[in-house]
Amino acid sequence: MIGGLTPLITFNGELGMRALLLAAGIGSRLRPLTNTTPKCLVPVHGRPLLDYWLDLVFEGGIERVLVNTHWLAPQVYDHVAKCRWAERIDLVHEETLLGTGGTVLANRPWFTNQRFLLAHADNLTDFDVAGFIRAHEGRPKGHAITMLGFRTDDPGSCGILELDQRNTVLAFHEKVPDPPGNLANGAVYIFEPEVMDVMASFGRPFVDLSTEVIPKFLGRILCFETSGYHRDIGTKESLQKAHSEFKQGSRGTLI
């Protein structure tokens, strides 16, 4: 049992990296669409965002996925139960949103004290998951996090990164008026177990990743820049752009 609920499918002993797909967002800026549709099930070219993610991570080498839910959770449960990856997915419901770090801590046993991938399932992306994992395995000594970076057309709305010559993240500027560049945090990470220890050190259930955890690891984060497509589907405008920019293929390719 995880988080007070029995998962859809229980862990059956696979070896390999696990992933947490954060899918509990309400999507208030996408209303009225999200009044009746969970944000993670908002469609692009007829496919829910969550389906793109599940194909992406499983085809990229992830062995098992945990999906958290909150708003309109029964729809997410029903959708996952019918998908082709159902036997490798666990679901956990949050009556009260815990924040990214809080969700990790609430389900800490599920990660089996191993490194894991974390992503926000309300983004649309087609990055190289296998390459991302390989980059983490070859990260500089002492680094505990690998972060996906992408080039944004709207730097003021993103967390902008400053890197050194090794692609180590030295500074992180969250939605500032005059950002120093356009390389943005893609909100996809691989964490070593020690990152969970830092989350736990706050001593409370709600922990924010961007403002509380990431700053503690500056100088120990490798940036993996994707050349593929990546967009936060947080507004009606961004959803419209995704429909015009992203062409559905096996997972999707940038036109």
Describe the function of each predicted region:
Residues I2-L21, R29, P43-H120, L124, ...:
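Conserved N-terminal catalytic core of the sugar/cofactor nucleotidyltransferase
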Residues T36-K39:
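Short alpha-helical oligomerization interface
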Residues L41, L91, I145, I221-C223, ...:
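Conserved beta-strand scaffold positions in the cores of enzyme catalytic domains, especially
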Residues P43, G149, E162, I190-E192:
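Short, well-ordered beta-strand micro-motif
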Residues R115-L117, L124, A130-R139, D153-P155, ...:
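Catalytic-core segments of class I nucleotidyltransferases/pyrophosphorylases
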Residues P140-F150:
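A short, conserved acidic/glycine-rich loop-to-beta-strand motif
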Residues E162-T168:
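Short acidic-glycine loop/turn motifs at beta-strand connectors
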